[in-house]
């Protein structure tokens, strides 16, 4: 091809060469995110709180089950009798069965006596540690309406008045509800207002059964022999009447009752309590011929006897460590409508005092009242029955230094407790009157006891379980 015949070809621009593909690099796996471990103190705190809540729920279930049983005690005139109601027996059977479920025969020895006392012992797991006996009572007072008891659980209490189905109000502004101000956000348990609740002393029973369960699940806790007594007829002053020491293998070193009503204090001394009965034997006659027929008006004579006692010795005039004389019952011993001739009236009298000299003065006043009555009513025979020691001051026989030990143990649980004098009696005080060792009384959670306003706080009961556990630990470490 010669150059003359050649044609010019259109030169198209060339597309840029594609960049060579980069060699694929292996993708590195992202390291797994490491979750920081929960600090040990926080984990322990969370576990402790979970356990606390679980125990409180157990306490609520346990107490409300106990409360539905009407275990009111009832008194008998004959001091040799020891009446037990069906409800008291049901209560004893329930606690016995529950304890046998909680522990084995090896680590918890359980017995129920023919008088419906329940005894339990956790054997010592170390040597040289004082033994402790904790006590509560299963019966409730006959001095308030009982029958069908309906406990009501009020969760997350808001601090206001609690309206009960019976139409009554439990208020923090009243004496019965003053402790409610300290229970905001907690669980309150009341009755329906028609009956008592039985917090005195089923709260104590709840605390002790829960304490037993707590101890058996805590293998690190060192302790001496631990005894638990669930008694009967405390509310009629006879809890010691059928107490059987042989169930405990001798006297314990330390005695502690769980039957108090003050969350800030525990009793270290109490009244000496004496019961006296006076019988006025008279005879009926037509009042129109009363002089000639030697009318023996036993009822008026009994009233006259009561009237001879100075008003300043009445309970309404007594406070602090002052004692009192209380003529609390006047009742016929015969059917006055069925018997045309005989009249007999019984006057029951309580003597309460801290000072033995005051007790002696009270006895002299009663003796003088009986003498004056015999002079004023010559046709009525005034008979003074032998007095009965109902309970004794626990301060006389309490374990030395126990008050300081309890204060120390409570402080470890963040609870401030103050020793106080008790204007009443406890199971420990009744045992002291029978020659047993006396001991203090701890708060059990009961409030407004012996009334239809009676109530308790579940968290209070839990707190006292932990205080009791701390007492056991402190005793072992002293």
Model-predicted regions and their roles:
Residues 53-86, 189-190, 389, 447-451:
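N-terminal capping segment at the start of a domain
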Residues 343, 416-470, 475:
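Zn-dependent metallopeptidase/amidohydrolase metal-coordination segment
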Residues 80-83, 325-335, 347-354, 381-403, ...:
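A short beta-alpha structural unit
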Residues 128-221, 225, 230, 463:
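Active-site metal-coordination/substrate-binding segment of hydrolases
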Residues 300-320, 324-326, 391-441:
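Active-site-adjacent substrate-binding region
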Residues 77-129, 133-135, 139, 412, ...:
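A non-catalytic alpha/beta surface segment that caps or lines the substrate-entry region
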């Amino acid at each position: 091809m010669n150059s003359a015949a050649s044609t010019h070809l259109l030169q198209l621009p060339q597309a840029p060469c594609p960049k060579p593909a980069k060699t694929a690099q292996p993708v590195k796996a992202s390291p797994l995110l490491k979750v920081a471990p929960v600090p040990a103190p926080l984990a322990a705190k969370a576990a402790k709180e979970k356990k606390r809540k679980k125990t409180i729920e157990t306490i609520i279930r346990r107490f409300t089950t106990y409360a539905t049983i009407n275990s009111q005690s009832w008194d008998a005139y004959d001091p040799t009798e020891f009446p037990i109601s069906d409800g008291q027996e049901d209560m004893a059977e329930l606690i016995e069965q529950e304890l046998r479920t909680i522990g084995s025969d090896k680590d918890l020895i359980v017995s129920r006596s023919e008088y419906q006392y329940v005894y339990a012992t956790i054997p010592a797991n170390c040597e040289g540690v004082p033994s402790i006996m904790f006590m509560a009572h299963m019966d409730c007072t006959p001095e308030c309406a009982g029958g069908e008891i309906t406990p009501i659980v009020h969760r997350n209490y808001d601090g206001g008045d609690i309206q009960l189905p019976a139409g009554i109000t439990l208020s923090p502004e009243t004496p019965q509800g003053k402790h409610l101000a300290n229970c905001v956000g907690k669980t309150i348990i009341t009755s329906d207002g028609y009956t008592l609740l039985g917090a005195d002393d089923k709260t104590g029973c709840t605390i002790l059964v829960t304490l037993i369960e707590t101890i058996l699940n805590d293998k690190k806790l060192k302790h001496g022999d631990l005894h638990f007594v669930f008694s009967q007829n405390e509310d009629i002053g006879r809890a010691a009447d059928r107490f059987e020491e042989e169930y405990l293998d001798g006297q314990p070193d330390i005695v502690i009752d769980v039957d108090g009503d003050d969350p800030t204090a525990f009793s270290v001394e109490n009244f000496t309590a004496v019961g006296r009965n006076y019988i006025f034997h008279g005879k009926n006659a037509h009042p129109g011929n009363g002089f000639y027929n030697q009318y023996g008006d036993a009822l008026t004579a009994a009233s006259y006897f009561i009237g001879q006692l100075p008003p300043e010795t009445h309970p309404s005039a007594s406070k602090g460590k002052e004692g009192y004389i209380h003529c609390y019952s006047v009742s016929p011993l015969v059917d006055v409508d069925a018997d045309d001739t005989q009249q007999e009236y019984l006057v029951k009298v309580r003597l309460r005092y801290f000072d033995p000299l005051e007790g002696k003065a009270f006895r002299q006043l009663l003796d003088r009242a009986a003498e004056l009555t015999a002079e004023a009513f010559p046709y009525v025979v005034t008979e003074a029955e032998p007095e009965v020691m109902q309970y004794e001051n626990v301060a006389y026989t309490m374990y030395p230094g126990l008050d300081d030990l309890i204060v120390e143990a409570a402080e470890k649980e963040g609870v401030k407790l103050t020793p106080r004098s008790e204007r009443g009696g406890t199971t420990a005080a009744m045992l002291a009157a029978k020659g047993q060792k006396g001991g203090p009384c701890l708060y059990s959670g009961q409030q407004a006891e012996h009334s239809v306003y009676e109530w308790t706080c579940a968290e209070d009961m839990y707190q006292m379980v932990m205080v009791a556990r701390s007492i056991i630990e402190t005793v072992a470490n002293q």
